[in-house]
Amino acid sequence: MKSVLIFLVAIALFSANIVSADEQTTRGRHTEPDDHHEKPTTQCTHEETTSTQHHHEEVVTTQTPHHEEKTTTEETHHSDDLIVHEGGKTYHVVCHEEGPIHIQEMCNKYIICSKSGSLWYITVMPCSIGTKFDPISRNCVLDN
């Protein structure tokens, strides 16, 4: 048994010396530059990048409440009176100038009048939940 142990220790010592010699050789090769060879140089590669310009268009949409009913408009030819059918009711609208106007009977909604030539067109717009149309500021404001 002693002979096996001595044999293993001898192999371990011999292996340690070989590794140690390799480490010294490796270190010598990398740390001591050879005068006959050029020093290693580092080259940085410059990659050119090109970018394509993208044109983005923002589209703003407003979501109408799900409970909103179909609105139709009819134009009358005999007067400036426009008729709005909404929620089973009929409203007569007279536009005097372009822009938003309030119809008292239409809860939380307003109408935008626009003119093209001699014809008036109207668009019914809802205010957001919790707001109402203020005829003075001509905007939807908090419903207090």
Swiss-Prot record:
Cited InterPro entries: Chitin-bd_dom, Chitin-bd_dom_sf
Pfam families referenced in this protein's UniProt entry, alphabetically: CBM_14
Region (Disordered): 24-77
Annotated disulfide bonds: C127-C140
Signal peptide (from-to): 1-20
Keyword presence, Signal: yes
Coiled coil location: none
Source species of the chain: Blomia tropicalis
Protein's name in the database: Major allergen Blo t 12
Top-rank taxon, per record: Eukaryota
Keyword Disulfide bond: yes
Gene3D superfamilies the UniProt entry points to: Chitin binding domain
Any GO CC annotation of this UniProt entry: extracellular region
Domain Chitin-binding type-2: 92-144
Keyword set, alphabetical order: Allergen, Chitin-binding, Disulfide bond, Signal
One MF annotation (Gene Ontology) recorded for this entry: chitin binding
